[in-house]
Regions:
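Membrane interfacial helix motifs at helix-loop boundaries and amphipathic/re-entrant anchors
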Residues: 1-3, 33-36, 53-56, 69-85
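Alpha-helical transmembrane segments
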Residues: 1-18, 87-92
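Alpha-helical transmembrane segments of multipass membrane proteins
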Residues: 11-15, 60, 64-67, 91-95, ...
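Membrane-water interface of transmembrane alpha-helices
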Residues: 16-34, 100-109
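Short membrane-interface loop/juxtamembrane segments of multi-pass integral membrane proteins
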Residues: 37-53
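Select subsegments of transmembrane alpha-helices in polytopic membrane proteins
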Residues: 50-63
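Alpha-helical transmembrane segments and their immediate juxtamembrane interface regions
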Residues: 81-118
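Cysteine-cluster motifs in flexible loop/terminal segments that predominantly coordinate metals
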Residues: 112-131
Length: 131
């Protein structure tokens, strides 16, 4: 039962850390954060999207940690399981809401202008353009 209550605590700490990195604009584009077509258009869109999603994500992590602590102090096994499940559902809902907000913020960022060709006929310009 002790291990069940630790699940939202550990997940909450990880989610809080990710939200904090996004909010402080320190999250790198290597697999974490809001990863939608809109946020992956440019580095600026990724930065803005994850900054907007940062605060709801931090709150989601705190909800997970609080739910885990509540589960640890519950006198019954059923109370521990209920506290854990409520915390996990709340954490998931807040992370999803933060992702939607981040996606919408990234949509507001202008799409990058395709890189121009210097006329060298090297054939590499298509690799420089991001559609």
């Amino acid at each position: 039962v002790f291990a069940v209550a630790l699940v939202p605590v550990v997940l909450g700490l990880v989610v809080t850390w990710g939200g904090l990195l996004g909010w402080r604009e320190k999250l790198s584009d290597r697999g974490a954060g809001v990863r939608t077509e809109a946020t992956l258009r440019s580095a600026e869109a990724f930065r803005i999207g994850n900054k907007v999603a940062g605060l709801p994500t931090i709150v989601a992590g705190v909800v997970g940690v609080v739910a885990g602590i509540a589960g640890l102090v519950m006198p019954t096994t059923a109370g521990t399981i209920v506290a854990t499940l409520v915390g996990l559902v709340g954490m998931f809902a807040l992370v999803a809401a933060g992702g939607v907000l981040g996606h919408r913020a990234a949509l507001a960022v202008r799409a990058p202008v395709p890189a121009g060709c210097s006329g060298c006929a090297c054939g590499g310009c298509s690799a420089l353009q991001k559609a």
